[in-house]
Amino acid sequence: MSKQRIYEYAKELNLKSKEIIDELKSMNIEVSNHMQALEDDQIKALDKKFKKEQKNDNKQSTQNNHQKSNNQNQNKGQQKDNKKNQQQNNKGNKGNKKNNRNNKKNNKNNKPQNQPAAPKEIPSKVTYQEGITVGEFADKLNVESSEIIKKLFLLGIVANINQSLNQETIELIADDYGVEVEEEVVINEEDLSIYFEDEKDDPEAIERPAVVTIMGHVDHGKTTLLDSIRHTKVTAGEAGGITQHIGAYQIENDGKKITFLDTPGHAAFTTMRARGAQVTDITILVVAADDGVMPQTIEAINHAKEAEVPIIVAVNKIDKPTSNPDRVMQELTEYGLIPEDWGGETIFVPLSALSGDGIDDLLEMIGLVAEVQELKANPKNRAVGTVIEAELDKSRGPSASLLVQNGTLNVGDAIVVGNTYGRIRAMVNDLGQRIKMAGPSTPVEITGINDVPQAGDRFVVFSDEKQARRIGESRHEASIVQQRQESKNVSLDNLFEQMKQGEMKDLNVIIKGDVQGSVEALAASLMKIDVEGVNVRIIHTAVGAINESDVTLANASNGIIIGFNVRPDSGAKRAAEAENVDMRLHRVIYNVIEEIESAMKGLLDPEFEEQVIGQAEVRQTFKVSKVGTIAGCYVTEGKITRNAGVRIIRDGIVQYEGELDTLKRFKDDAKEVAKGYECGITIENYNDLKEGDVIEAFEMVEIKR
């Protein structure tokens, strides 16, 4: 147990440290300052002195207060006496005033002692959000920020009170205090996908109609099949038949409803999936019995498989003399669609959309597949779903066809649809009837939104119109920012596409190199490239590192930058990222020519892309026999990793490119060294390192095309 210091003892008794020091000196005890530790016998001697005095002071204060009370009562009784008595009373009062002054003085000395606040207990569990700072984490642990900073320093992390902590560091500190930590998941209310949940586990969920999409090759009978189902199952007497085209419709078969999406082919299907909309439960693949598998048939199979949607094959046109259903089955087995009769799991239904034969069998199979899938939704929830179609009507304004996927949609609901918002003014079903509510898997057309959304956008109903407006406006602003950030500049990756669209006549190129001879040779070689439809135009050449003005010129002229044996400086890197300017860095002229020529011919398909992960500045060099040159470095950007490739840059010009030999922190090998730390580096097969050189670390990252 640590000994008590003089200032701590004084604080405990609400006294000044000087009083304790004086008393100790009177006891012939040598005292240097208030930080001196007290021995047990010294504390006992001080306790006798000061605690006894405090008891006496408290006792005297109580007596004086009692006397004051008696004097006040006596004064009240004597007010009825004569003048003489009053004068005597006045004399007495003078005495009382004196006593009162003494009492006040005593009371002043005997104020309640300001005991130090008890330290807050460290909680057993704390929650934190990503990006929590040292100060915020210290508050949650009920400790001083300086304590956390000390612990971080011992872990080799130099931090201040406003520094953000990562998950690993937070867990290490919490473990040191014996505290359990849990990261809070911050829900972004603008992300509409969080409102879409699987309703199978909801106890209040009930069965919902299946949503079916019909796909297939051109002229194989998709539209005819849709019309046949529609006319078979929907009577013309229902509100004048189908009077409203909203991109979907519902039919009833054996007391169960089925929703069909009347989408224009695979493009819309793909667009919806690209926007995250998974609306289809079952895919009907229409294949003509007299034609077999065609390119769009394969495309449809791939779409359905990627979406993990069950496929029912409708073999159409069986009434034709040239039909051969067995050939269709045989061809489809090559794509993993094996009929049940042949030991597979795919349902095949032969039918004729023109005559109506087999339509009932198809609907029955749809019902069976839907039953196996256990499609459920909770109609008591607020509605969520997907946009099927949208348009701007001259008389009604923006309108959207929606498919309700869960919950119930009502007229008057506050709604966010994609990047638009509003309150539903009117709602029309697939029969053209005005309705007030629509349950799960029901297609409806609504009006009342402020703008036209896109097909595949999601919609969510909110209880508060202000909230819907705020989220809708915020999503709209975010989409504008995203559109502005999207690349409009030419790059070698999109060059061929722009050439095909007739947008590119000249490819503007800026060349920066290490020496003038290389720059001139490269410019001459590029000018010789001859590809029909586009010309190479050199708009600027210079010697030296790529700088910010080069990026500005490339952005203004819609050009690309080629660096030959040079690197961009930090300002140029930031500007290129902000303006989406394409920079290509090479060390071999042939590679430059080949890359640009391939891009112009539409053959460019790079699999890997270089990613710079960090930079270190050489502060000092040491020559060691049998080892070579060791560079004492300071990491200025990112991090240096043991397995990264490196290049040595001197005055913006690449001197050498190779690999790290060793990476050390003090005497220990390190896997990586982060920004702000010093390290020792040796380069494999390279010893010509000098102070001021920049070591750039990079790695090759596989990119998707």
From Swiss-Prot:
Biased composition regions of type Basic residues, renumbered to the chain: 94-108
Region ranges (G5): 352-354
Span list, region G2: 241-245
Residue numbers spanned by region G3: 262-265
The keyword Hydrolase appears for this protein: no
Residue ranges of the region described as G4: 316-319
Location(s), subcellular: Cytoplasm
Transmembrane segments: none
Renumbered residue ranges of the record's region G1: 216-223
Domain tr-type G stretches: 207-376
An MF annotation (GO) of this entry: GTPase activity
Principal cellular location given in the protein's record: cytoplasm
Keyword DNA-binding: no
Top-level taxon of the source organism: Bacteria
InterPro entries: EF-G-like_DII (IPR053905), IF2_II (IPR044145), IF2_N (IPR006847), P-loop_NTPase (IPR027417), Small_GTP-bd (IPR005225), T_Tr_GTP-bd_dom (IPR000795), TF_IF2_bacterial-like (IPR000178), TIF_IF2 (IPR015760)
Region (Disordered): 40-124
Family of the protein in this entry: Belongs to the TRAFAC class translation factor GTPase superfamily. Classic translation factor GTPase family. IF-2 subfamily.
Name of the protein in its database record: Translation initiation factor IF-2
Organism: Staphylococcus aureus (strain MSSA476)
